[in-house]
Swiss-Prot record:
GO BP term, pick one: carbohydrate metabolic process
PROSITE patterns in the cross-refs: NODB (PS51677)
Protein name: Peptidoglycan deacetylase-like protein FGM2
Binding site for Zn(2+): D49, H124, H128
Family assignment from sequence similarity: Belongs to the polysaccharide deacetylase family.
UniProt keyword terms in alphabetical order: Hydrolase, Metal-binding, Zinc
Superkingdom as given in the UniProt entry: Eukaryota
Effect of a null allele: Leads to reduced virulence and produces significantly smaller lesions and fewer spikelets with blight symptoms on susceptible wheat cultivars.
GO molecular-function terms, A-Z: hydrolase activity, acting on carbon-nitrogen (but not peptide) bonds; metal ion binding
Function (record text): Peptidoglycan deacetylase-like protein; part of the Fg3_54/C64 gene cluster that mediates the biosynthesis of the octapeptide fusaoctaxin A, a virulence factor that is required for cell-to-cell invasiveness of plant host. The 2 nonribosomal peptide synthetases NRPS9 and NRPS5 form an assembly line which likely utilizes GABA as a starter unit (loaded on the unique module M1 of NRPS9) and sequentially incorporates seven extender units composed of the residues L-Ala, L-allo-Ile, L-Ser, L-Val, L-Ser, L-Leu and L-Leu, respectively.
Gene this protein is translated from: FGM2
Expression triggers: Expression is positively regulated by the cluster-specific transcription factor FGM4 and is induced during infection of coleoptiles of wheat seedlings. The fusaoctaxin A gene cluster is silenced by H3K27 trimethylation by the histone methyltransferase KMT6.
Length: 338
């Protein structure tokens, strides 16, 4: 196209040509930068504590039938409600259930329904024991018993473990490695990435009766193990803020489900924008820890379903996977055979 500038002043002509040139340059600039691609794994887990939670870490001399009935609710009501929610959302077979041996044997029909849903079955003690209160032989006996129970239910050896109440010690870690477990999920060394479990820092507490020079020294670096660690911490779970346990010191019970949902969404949004290292978009994992005792309650269940649907709405860059799937993919990425 030829522009006739005859009759235009030289200054007007130059201005017109400048606008055309500027317009041409803008036309070559994309309207928006493409969104960074990432792969986000949603790891939904359920701890089927039920009555076992009151027998081990939750035991107290003041506990009574009223307290135990909350565990009965978890088994007889909460499990069914959660299974239906997970089925409606379309992720039932992508969930990992951590089931104490006591729950497997006390609620066999509910446990069978979990297995039939296609979910992964992992271990969580027998009576929700505090591993730090057990000697090595007790820990081994419990683990062996629970492995046998899980194998009888699924026909498959379990590969994952979560310490009840996250109470884990060096003996537990050594036992998991000796027994060939693929992963543990009891520790908080990261909140959005898998990593190799290590043998644990040998921490010596300060002894104020001695000279300061006796404790002013760094901790020895622990040995890296072959077991994968999948993040867990108190801010990823439902029970502590939303379930009142009268004789458990860290329970609250009267935090609204909307407050917890907001916290989880805030965490996801930050990771989506800034990635696990805070430098920008990147791949990350997003674990959630639910309980039929808590998320099975009527005033919480709707929020849980809404949260899961919200996560699904993020599209193909977000996928729900079992803990086993996430751990095996981590090993493949590290080029270490599982």
């Amino acid at each position: 196209m030829q522009i006739d500038h005859s009759g235009d002043s030289s200054e007007a002509s130059q201005a017109h040509d400048s606008k055309l040139h500027h317009s041409h340059l803008l036309g070559n600039i994309p309207l928006g930068l493409p969104e960074a691609r990432r792969r986000v794994k949603i790891l939904v887990s359920v701890d089927f504590d039920a009555v076992s939670g009151w027998m081990g870490t939750g035991q107290h001399s003041r506990n009574c039938l009223s307290d135990y009935s909350a565990g009965i609710f978890a088994g007889r009501v909460g499990v069914g409600r959660l299974l239906k929610i997970l089925d409606r959302v379309g992720i039932a077979e992508k969930v990992t259930w951590f089931i104490p041996g006591h729950s497997m044997e006390t609620f066999p029909l509910e446990t069978k329904a979990i297995v039939d849903s296609g979910a992964e079955i992992a271990l969580h003690g027998y009576c929700h024991e505090d591993c730090t209160q057990l000697d090595p032989q007790q820990q081994q006996d419990i683990l062996d018993k629970c492995i046998t129970l899980a194998e009888s239910l699924t026909g498959k050896r379990p590969v994952g473990f979560r310490a009840p109440l996250y109470r884990i010690d060096h003996d537990t870690i050594s036992l998991l490695e000796r027994k060939g477990f693929l992963y543990d999920t009891s520790l908080s060394g990261h909140d959005a990435q898998l990593y190799y479990l290590d043998s644990g820092f040998p921490l010596d507490v300060v002894d104020y009766s001695k000279s300061a020079s006796t404790w002013m020294k760094p901790s020895p670096q622990p040995r890296q193990l072959s077991v994968v660690e999948i993040p867990a911490n108190w801010y990823m779970e439902d029970m502590t803020p939303m379930q009142f346990l009268p004789n458990v010191t860290n329970s609250h019970g009267f935090v609204s489900s909307e407050a917890i949902e907001k916290m989880w969404k805030d965490r996801f949004n930050w990771l989506w924008n800034w990635g696990p290292d805070g430098s920008g978009p990147g791949d990350f994992v997003f674990p959630l820890v639910l309980h039929p005792d808590t998320s099975g309650m009527a005033h919480v269940a709707g929020t849980i379903e809404g949260m899961l649907r919200w996560l699904k709405e993020w599209g193909p860059q977000v996928e729900f996977v079992t803990y086993e799937e996430a751990a095996r993919e981590f090993l493949l990425d590290k080029e270490v055979p599982a």
